[in-house]
Structures are given as structure tokens and as C-alpha cells.
């Protein structure tokens, strides 16, 4: 059951509850043969098809970021601490692999090695893009998108950073993890990565 609170068109606070009981992502009748027959979307000889790309979907997430001073002033108990953040870019024609340069940069800023990271949430716009990042950085696939990426769970545009952070924190709590990374590619060759230390 999901509870949604919002301000309606009359300016009054309204709360509604509803049950999410349908996953709109999977399509009935999908088969390996049907997926293999899909045409490439970007280049005639390309590998990216509608079958190995994330669907656009609705989604919402909320993350509140504040200084340590403000946390103390408000007497709050933070869930995680952002250890480092890095943004970088690659050639726009190879859009999708920005995390290949952003993740090492964030690790260096944090003074951490890749093998100290327990979990990674990597945005998965396309399977080929995610696989390229995993391969280029020699990431352990057992700690990347452990509950599925955007192809399985959806890709709500404009919500990626918050959504992946919330997913990371939930899984870090379950596994008693210390360090995790949220990383994503951004259009025109950009990449971003944030390293978090779980505090709960």
C-alpha cells in the first residue's frame, strides 16, 4: 500500500492510499526470439534495441542533503554521509560510459579503493552501457544493481539520483554495508558518482 499526500487544486492537503498491484514493465508474450528480432534503434548495425533499453516510467524519491552543522542544530540522525562526489565527461558520441571516469575520480577524492565498496547502484539506461561500465572498471557484478537496474525497475527521468540513493541506502541497511556508490550516465557524455558511508 502506498500513501500519497499532496496539495490539491483548491490548496487543501489531501491524502490518498492505494495498492500497487501491477508492474507495467514486463510484456506478456515476450520471448528470446522476439527480443532477438528487434531492430537496433541508434545505428543499423548497433546492439541497442527496445528490448535491452530501460522503459520510461513514473517514479518518485526524496533525499534530504544537509551540512553536518545543520544536522547537529536540528538534532537529526542521518542515514548516510556523502563522502565524495565527482562529475566528469567523455566524448558525447560514446554517451553512457561517463561513470567510467566519474567513479575513479570519486574514489580518489574519498581516499578509497574499489574493493572497499560494498554496493553500487549504476543507472542502466541501456544494457550495453551498463555492461561497458562494469567491464571497463572491472566492477564485481555481484554488488552492482543487486535488486535490478532500470531495465527491470524502470527509469523515471529526473529522479535517477534520488531513486538510486534510496535503493542503495535500503540495501546497505539490510546488508550492514559501510560504503556504497551511486553513479549515472547523463546525456552528451557526462557521468556522475557519489560515494556514501552508511551511518545507521
Residue ranges of each PLM-predicted region?
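Phosphate/pyrophosphate-binding loops at sites that engage ATP/ADP/AMP, CoA/4′-phosphopantetheine
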Residues: 71-75, 104-119, 137-138
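Active-site pocket-shaping loop/turn-to-helix segments
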Residues: 45-61, 83-109, 118, 122-124, ...
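N-terminal extracellular/periplasmic Venus flytrap/periplasmic-binding protein-like
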Residues: 1-73, 136, 141-143
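Beta-strand segments within the central parallel beta-sheet cores of soluble alpha/beta enzyme folds
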Residues: 1, 76-87, 114-124, 143-149, ...
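Conserved beta-strand-centric core segments of catalytic alpha/beta enzyme folds
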Residues: 49-66, 161-200
